From Swiss-Prot:
UniProt cross-references to Pfam families, sorted A to Z: Leu_Phe_trans
Recorded family membership: Belongs to the L/F-transferase family.
Catalytic reaction(s) noted: N-terminal L-lysyl-[protein] + L-leucyl-tRNA(Leu) = N-terminal L-leucyl-L-lysyl-[protein] + tRNA(Leu) + H(+); N-terminal L-arginyl-[protein] + L-leucyl-tRNA(Leu) = N-terminal L-leucyl-L-arginyl-[protein] + tRNA(Leu) + H(+); L-phenylalanyl-tRNA(Phe) + an N-terminal L-alpha-aminoacyl-[protein] = an N-terminal L-phenylalanyl-L-alpha-aminoacyl-[protein] + tRNA(Phe)
Protein name: Leucyl/phenylalanyl-tRNA--protein transferase
Database matches in PANTHER family: LEUCYL/PHENYLALANYL-TRNA--PROTEIN TRANSFERASE (PTHR30098), LEUCYL_PHENYLALANYL-TRNA--PROTEIN TRANSFERASE (PTHR30098:SF2)
EC code: 2.3.2.6
Gene giving rise to this polypeptide: aat
Molecular functions per Gene Ontology: leucyl-tRNA--protein transferase activity
Species the sequence originates in: Pseudomonas paraeruginosa (strain DSM 24068 / PA7)
Length: 226
């Protein structure tokens, strides 16, 4: 049975209570209060829903992750990086990045990054929890992504691209930055060909929970300069 959350309690059900079909649906309801969002990521779940639906909380099994040391950069992408076609920045324009990620796409109906979702993550950004990566070309924002940093873990949320390889360049730059700072895992949530081409792979929900337990409160070993 699906658990419905109240607005006065930030506790989530155990991850092993998530449904098998649809895969990983753990709970519904609640709100997007920053304290609840932080509690959700610490617990191992994330919000994902469409306009008109209640807030749905997910913990899929398996979970798609990328270990920084397993980052794969193809020859063509390495060439693009060497050519320095793009400028990459951190936290320069979080709002523009999340709005671009929320924009309609040809291959999808609607967006799950609703206006309340955008406002909630902007608040997390103001609190220093959520971060953005911007990719610029000739002064124009052409790619980027955003996510949350907790302990030695980074939780990726969404990315966008308006130029060939722009989001990949932003992602690779972020992964290298996190690796140098001592991060051990990047949560990619759900599988995509794009992410698998960069080295992402699936691990069990149990293994993901082990990473959470071990690293969510452990400070990075290096300097993280967002």
């Amino acid at each position: 049975m699906l658990t419905w959350l109240s607005r006065t309690n930030y506790d989530f059900p155990p991850l092993d209570k998530a449904l098998q079909e649809p895969n990983g649906l753990l709970a519904a309801g609640g709100d997007l209060d920053p304290r609840r969002l932080i509690a959700a990521y610490r617990h191992g779940c994330f919000p994902w829903y469409q306009d008109g639906q209640p807030i749905l909380w997910w913990s899929p099994d398996p979970r798609t992750v990328l270990l920084p040391e397993e980052l794969h950069v193809s020859r063509s992408l390495a060439k693009c990086l060497r050519q320095q076609r793009f400028e990459v920045t951190f936290n320069r324009d979080f709002r523009a990045v999340i709005q671009a990620c929320a924009a309609p796409r040809d291959y999808a109906d609607g967006t799950w990054i609703t206006t309340p979702m955008q406002l909630a993550y902007q608040e997390l950004h103001l609190r220093g929890v959520a971060h953005s990566v911007e990719v610029w070309q000739a002064g124009q924002l052409v790619g980027g992504l955003y996510g949350l940093a907790m302990g030695r873990l980074f939780f990726g949320e969404s990315m966008f691209s308006r130029a060939d390889n722009a989001s990949k360049v932003g992602f690779v730059t972020l992964v290298r930055h996190l690796r140098d700072a001592g991060f051990v895992l990047i949560d990619c949530q759900m599988p995509t060909r794009h992410l698998h081409s960069l080295g992402a792979r699936a691990i069990s929900r149990e293994a993901f929970a082990d990473y959470l337990q071990r690293y969510r409160d452990e400070s990075p070993s290096g300097t993280l300069d967002f």
